[in-house]
Curated annotation (Swiss-Prot):
<dbReference type="GO" id="GO:0002098">
    <property type="term" value="P:tRNA wobble uridine modification"/>
</dbReference>
<feature type="binding site">
    <location>
        <position position="373"/>
    </location>
    <ligand>
        <name>FAD</name>
    </ligand>
</feature>
<dbReference type="InterPro" id="IPR044920">
    <property type="entry name" value="MnmG_C_subdom_sf"/>
</dbReference>
<feature type="binding site">
    <location>
        <position position="127"/>
    </location>
    <ligand>
        <name>FAD</name>
    </ligand>
</feature>
<dbReference type="GO" id="GO:0050660">
    <property type="term" value="F:flavin adenine dinucleotide binding"/>
</dbReference>
<keyword id="KW-0963">Cytoplasm</keyword>
<dbReference type="InterPro" id="IPR026904">
    <property type="entry name" value="MnmG_C"/>
</dbReference>
<protein>
    <recommendedName>
        <fullName>tRNA uridine 5-carboxymethylaminomethyl modification enzyme MnmG</fullName>
    </recommendedName>
</protein>
<dbReference type="InterPro" id="IPR036188">
    <property type="entry name" value="FAD/NAD-bd_sf"/>
</dbReference>
<dbReference type="GO" id="GO:0030488">
    <property type="term" value="P:tRNA methylation"/>
</dbReference>
<dbReference type="InterPro" id="IPR002218">
    <property type="entry name" value="MnmG-rel"/>
</dbReference>
<keyword id="KW-0520">NAD</keyword>
<keyword id="KW-0274">FAD</keyword>
<comment type="subunit">
    <text>Homodimer. Heterotetramer of two MnmE and two MnmG subunits.</text>
</comment>
<dbReference type="InterPro" id="IPR004416">
    <property type="entry name" value="MnmG"/>
</dbReference>
<dbReference type="InterPro" id="IPR040131">
    <property type="entry name" value="MnmG_N"/>
</dbReference>
<dbReference type="Pfam" id="PF13932">
    <property type="entry name" value="SAM_GIDA_C"/>
</dbReference>
Length: 632
């Protein structure tokens, strides 16, 4: 079929949420003429649920996005109202930053960034169909009948894809926050042959700040010590007048109200059909599943400086409006609170992610990429990370350049994408530190060391950032080398000082680096013995030095594991392999191989239901059966 196109682009991105914004900024910054199409321009980078960025694992993803040249970290650093480092009492592998956002300012700032970006056209329009010829994307069709040509299309529709809002007995077609749902596009994705799933998520009610009795709650302030998501942000710009959050709890009365109205809860009445998030359950689900708990935490989170709306984190619900009011008034501090918005659930279609490659391109259609909640994830950060990778690979494909695949040992983004394309997901996927087997080398403090060079190679890291990175890396390398070259000897003067500080004396000569491996010796103590660096070091470099030195043995073991896995990742599996021709592999393994069609031995080994014996048989088969190459 010959199409008459009214406009032509290199890449078209459908949806301007957190995934779509990162995807479109990446493609345009890499030199591709890009269209970012959205149902509603006023909802660009909107936060329909929690007014925050970061958190456990997620905060590290934002740092990775920033290190690669993405925008989320810079944007939240300009628009937060509170910043807090989590898990400070635990090891460095699980520390992560979380910011409370001014949600309207966040969206406005991001929209301004998109509007200023060269090569990027922003358009309010509904995309109804993706045009495909001979298994390859050629463009899109709008609801008004316009046809736009494209060499690649990135679908980032979030929860709008056949979205339906559920509130008590009420259910109606809608995207998030009562925006339009994208129904025709959902139908057409299915017609293209993609396997579609149905998920559900929810959001809590918002209450009016001036109606809250804060005296009955516990204050949750931000940190005084400067921390940032972007490696380019300055400590001098760290916000001093942060806005606190507040902690309260449900109680037995709250639980009684929920239990007495479970028959009206869509979660239990059968109205909700989609699968909900395991790690962000509704309050009614929590009360039923954890009936022995006397109370559940609720955090009162301001949604910005210029609004009275307060997000009641932990109270996600789709109970009827009258029940929500009673529930709120049963909570300490909220006895007289005014409910400004009701909580609700939303069901939406997803593209089952086992149909994707690690580039986030669909296996079925060349040039068609998907990212974000469209792939079954939950969270703004997971969406933004996928959007960035999908956008990068869409641009690389258009330009005929090698694709970018982040491995599990490269980034949390790599862990997430590998989980999605290798294992799929039966529920909204959330990143957790426990999902990363190499988490000690995927830390908050070293995301730039891991990824900035990659961002530079693909054209997303500008000269200013690259220069700052080179200075930091040189300072780090030089100081590490210096600490490893200076020796402390167990002489009387040295040991007298060591003992004065309350530490065990030296029995053998050791380098300053070895001295720092002692749990009680920090960088400041070490340099008090050996003298300071040639130039003043930033606190973030000192933090990185302490972590790398104190955990060196564990880090080395992790890197050894990475090297072993790399060898398995380098063993490619032909695209045209006949899985039925391989004798002796288990039936379950054969079925999984057919469904996922892994690209490497490493990926095959991570598929659930596949055991080491199956991998051994597969490797023997490949060694004796040709060297066909995988092509897309």
């Amino acid at each position: 079929m010959t199409h008459e196109f009214t406009e032509s682009y290199d890449v078209i991105v459908i949806g301007a949420g957190h995934a779509g914004v990162e995807a479109s900024l990446a493609t345009s910054r890499m030199g591709c003429k890009t269209l970012l199409a959205t149902i509603n321009l006023d909802m660009l980078a909107f936060m329909p649920c929690n007014p925050s960025i970061g958190g456990s694992a997620k905060g590290i993803v934002v740092r990775e996005i920033d290190a690669l040249g993405g925008e989320m970290g810079k944007n939240i650093d300009k628009t937060y109202i509170q910043m807090k480092m989590l898990n400070t009492g635990k090891g460095p592998a699980v520390r992560a930053l979380r910011a409370q956002a001014d949600k309207s300012l966040y969206a406005r700032e991001m929209k301004h960034t998109v509007e200023k970006q060269a090569n990027l056209t922003l358009r309010q329009t509904m995309i109804d169909d993706i045009l495909v010829e001979d298994g390859r994307v050629v463009g899109v069709l709008t609801a008004t009948g316009q046809k736009f040509a494209a060499k690649a299309v990135v679908v980032t529709t979030g929860t709008a894809l056949r979205g339906e809002i559920i509130l008590g007995e009420l259910k109606y077609s809608s995207g998030p926050n009562n925006s339009l749902a994208s129904v025709t596009l959902a139908d057409n994705l299915k017609k293209l042959g993609l396997e579609i799933g149905r998920f559900k998520t929810g959001t809590p009610p918002r209450v009016k700040a001036s109606s809250i009795n804060y005296d009955q709650t516990e204050i949750q302030p931000g940190d005084d010590k400067p921390n940032h998501f972007s490696f380019m942000s300055k400590d001098a710009d760290y916000l001093k007048d942060q806005i606190p959050c507040w902690l309260t709890y449900t109680n037995q009365t709250s639980h009684d109200i929920i239990n007495q109205n479970l028959y009206r809860a869509p979660m239990f009445s059968g109205i909700v059909k989609g699968v909900g998030p395991r790690y962000c359950p509704s309050i009614e689900d929590k009360i039923v599943r954890f009936a022995d708990k006397e109370r559940h935490q609720l955090f009162l989170e301001p949604e910005g400086r210029d609004t009275e709306e307060v997000y009641v984190q932990g109270l996600s619900t789709s109970l009827p409006e009258d029940v929500q009011k009673d529930l709120i008034h049963s909570i300490k501090g909220l006895e007289k609170a005014e409910m400004m918005r009701t909580g609700y659930a939303i069901e939406y279609d997803i593209v089952l992610p086992h149909q994707l490659r690690a580039t986030l391109e669909t296996k079925l259609i060349s040039g068609l990429f998907t990212a974000g909640q469209t792939n079954g994830t939950s969270g703004y950060e997971e969406a933004a990370g996928q959007g960035l990778i999908a956008g990068i690979n869409a641009a690389l494909k258009v330009q005929g350049k090698p694709e970018l695949i982040l491995k599990r040992s490269d980034a949390y983004i790599g862990v997430m994408i590998d989980d999605l394309v290798t294992k799929g997901t039966l529920e909204p996927y959330r990143l957790l530190t426990s999902r990363a087997e190499y988490r000690l080398i995927l830390r908050h403090d070293n995301a730039d060391m891991r990824l900035t060079e990659i961002g530079r190679d693909i054209g997303l890291v500008d000269d200013e950032r690259w220069k700052a990175f080179e200075i930091k890396k040189n300072q780090f390398d030089n100081e590490l080398k210096r600490l490893n070259s200076i020796k402390l000897k167990p002489v009387k003067a040295t040991n007298d000082r060591v003992q004065e500080l309350g530490f065990k004396p030296l029995t053998d000569a050791m380098t300053a680096k070895e001295f720092m491996r002692r749990p009680e010796i920090d960088y400041a103590t070490a340099v008090s013995f050996v003298g300071p660096a040639a130039e003043d070091l930033d606190a973030k470099i000192i933090e990185l030095l302490e972590t790398e030195i104190k955990y060196e043995g564990y880090i080395r073991k992790a890197l050894d594991q990475v090297a072993k896995m790399k060898r398995m990742e380098e063993k490619r599996i032909p695209a045209n392999i006949d899985w039925d021709a391989i004798d002796s592999i288990a039936t379950e393994a054969r079925q999984k191989f057919k469904k996922i069609n892994p690209e490497t031995i490493g990926q095959a080994s991570r598929i659930s239901g596949v055991n080491p014996a199956d991998i051994s048989i597969l490797m023997i088969y490949l060694e004796g059966n040709g060297k066909a190459h995988r092509k897309y």
